[in-house]
Amino acid sequence: MLDQVNLNQPDIDKGTYKETHDALIERLVTLQQQARLQSVGLVVLFEGWNGAGKGSRISDLMFNLDARATSVHVTGDFDVDEARAFSDAGHNVTGYWPFMQQFWQALGPRGAITFYDRGWYSVAAERAMCRAFGGLNPKRKEGKKDTVRGDQLAARKEAGVCLASIREFERGLVDDGYEVVKFFIHVSAEGQRERLERLAADPTTAWRVDKKRLERIGNYEYAYSIYDLMLEGSNFAFAPWTLVNGEDKRRANIVIAQTLVRALESALARKEAANSASAASAASSVEPVSPEVPVNSADGAAKQPPRFAAPATSRFHLIDDAPTLAGVDHSLSLSPEEYKDELKSLQKRLFRLESNMYQARIPLMVMYEGWDAAGKGGNIKRVAQSLDARAYTIFPSPAPTAPELAHPHLWRYWTRLPKAGHVGIYDRSWYGRVLVERVEGYASPERLTQAYDEINAFEKDLVDWGAILLKFWVEVSPDEQLRRFEERQSNPAKQWKITDDDWRNREKYPQYKEAIEDMFRLTSTSFAPWIILESDDKRYARVKALRTIVAALEDAGLSD
């Protein structure tokens, strides 16, 4: 793709530039405010050569835009030493955090513009080079200037994993109401050398160009081939590349401004069309209400949302024997004596394994979903009791806050991950989208349809990072749940555990059961299957959870 960029275009004169650029910026400023009001998010990625002027192009835009609705994320240098250390450890963990975590963390809300100065493509290319060559400076074969040594197969594999993650990230943003604009600032080898040497010679800017960057100038041809392949493989219809001639900053500024104006105009037009369609649909679905029939039932529950038809399949590899609620054996139990002995033994083993896990820098994520009063909290306590308090975090999932609602659903979980070597325990999770939000009608049918594979993509990223991911469904029969509800209601010490919402959810058992079965079917992947904890006997469920965690750590090569 880079050969499409004409680097020999004549420079634009100052007068023509000012007139054209000023008009574009005026339009862009207006569109930014409209996007802010309509909650249209804009993600703007600047990739390109070192010294191509990415930072300057962003600065020129930031000078004119509303700073209250813009942010800039500067992607730091790839840490080769960290990558080598994790690779040498031999546990398939790629770093302290997943590849895409920093970019999710920096994502602004809908209605804002988020600029990325370098981003996921730079990191993907650097990871691939590091995997192939053990660093960012390819070693050339002696006597062959155009040939480099390295593990090309490993590089292609790493690049493939990264590009798959990138595609899901960009697709998810677009599906969630963001516009994604990607610029690659291209300059010639001579132009790059001249700029970097000029920066290095100026005491004011010399700090921006270290020795390693200057050394990489000699890798231009090899880096060109990597960039070109990367651009070809990621020129998605929903997030295409705009190639920019970086040799002329005036021409570059005009192309960038034109592209952003077109992107926001297109996004706002789609938003208006979607709002009109939604309003028309709502108007056509309104039914006359009889004076004798209240809109809400006596207990205050709202009218049920229409039945949702889940997708038939997934883009991801699903296991053939996904669990079902019908297959649960509710009679499984342990005697108090068996429970006491096994609990003590397993907790000791987990404590020792967790210490080894920390030293090996393996992240562990244990996620709990289940019926109200199924015993999630008590199960979590017995797991946490086995761990060093400094090594784990329990992440609850209450109703989302206003900032969380202004971001994609998974943003609140991408920003709540355990560091490599630590444990994250999730008391309810990202599956709320396909459970409570589905049953209560909080999410649109379109977003629900997309949610299953968005979750699968998220979990694939976690597993590719090297995390041990365990997904527990804590199951209890309706009869046992009713007994526990009544016990809580009659016991002053436990009354805080039972709410009106619990009773309302119980009344919606058929809707939740259908949602759960669809969840099992569409998110029981080969890399992150569901595990049912039969919890009519809480003792049995607690021991099974501990057994499962211990086995997973041992399967990862750890020993106690």
Please state what every model-predicted region is.
Residues 1-560:
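Glycine-rich phosphate-binding loop of ATP-dependent small-molecule kinases
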